[in-house]
Amino acid sequence: DGKDNVVIICSIENFDPIGIHTGDSITVAPAQTLSDKEYQRMRDASIAIIREIGVDTGGSNIQFALNQHDGRMVVIEMNPRVSRSSSLASKATGFPIAKIAAKLAVGLSLDEIPNDITRETPASFEPTIDYVVTKFPRFAFEKFPAADPTLTTQMKSVGEVMSIGRTFKESLQKALRSLEIGSYGLENVPADMSLIKSRLKTPNAERVWFIAQALREGMSIREIYELTWIDPWFLQNLKQIVDMEKEIEGSKENIIFSLDPLNPGPLESLILRAKRYGFSDRRIAQLLDMQETDIRHLRRKNNIQAVYKIVDTCAAEFAAYTPYLYSTYEVPYYRVQGSKDLRIQGSNPRPLGPSTPVVDNEANPGNR
């Protein structure tokens, strides 16, 4: 602001290594693999850069690349404006960057602008995130068969989806089934090992599915890392999803048996863990060769229901008056007051367009 106050709204980490345009990479907020020391180095560098460039008021986004083997950090770019990353950061945190930037431009300072969600804290309070946001790019190579599907520094995605969960695994799987490409998770990819290794080595739109398939085929995280240079933390999370799939598939007899109301099986823990990993009822049904309605019936029978938590910029430290909600399978949960039920009709989710994120009804602040 005009008083030289600076706040960091959000840290966003790319799933893919350097060499792929940020708009074509899966991104995660907050950053998951940085140590506190690395984060503070980036924070200090960001503040120094924005001051050196001469941004009097408003927002900027600064991108870094970090070599975690030797600690070398370089600046990729600095955008002294509201950008696509600003839009993602606003949605991820509930902090209205464009609105605040406009007020700063007319002379207000950060400590003079109230937070509309808490009505207590000023804009100089940095947002706190107690959830994980995943942005997944949407490609349309099926409409352009002559286009090269290899991902490079030139952006090729036509849109993106954003999802929120308590963990990276949950938010990733939510994003996968929001793409409207017929995917409900990390489904099997029919491919031999040579094709799998080729798809791992060459960045492409389906690489996350091929990583999961490589894990199913017995490749180690180290082998996949050496082909993709994707941080092992992300690969370990994908392995946990694949391991959960195997556990579900290995429980077919128990699941089927538990559908008999006279002989219920002790499956609450397995189904609850699967839902916390972000598995949809349809994906669980695919793994068990069952109907989606059977899984939903089993869930409800065992009182495994989605609950709702709030995006309030402060991790529930203060009361929230205008937060928005996301679903998860965890307690405690946010209770919506009132006895009336509402039915929302409209065009949401919006269809994907050029660099347009999908907004689903559940995450829309107006649909509460």
Model features per residue range: what roles?
Residues 300-335, 356-368:
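Non-catalytic terminal/interface segments that mediate subunit docking, oligomerization
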Residues 227-236, 286-298:
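Short, basic interhelical loop/turn and adjoining N-cap
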Residues 129, 252-253, 284, 312:
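Short alpha-helix boundary/capping motifs
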Residues 1-247, 256-257, 268-270, 274-278, ...:
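ATP-dependent carboxylate activation and anion-phosphoryl transfer catalytic cores
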Residues 251, 258-266, 337-355:
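Intrinsically disordered, low-complexity proline-rich regions
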Residues 266-269, 321:
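Short, basic, helix/turn surface patches
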Residues 277, 283-287:
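Extended, domain-scale alpha-helical bundle/helix-rich regions
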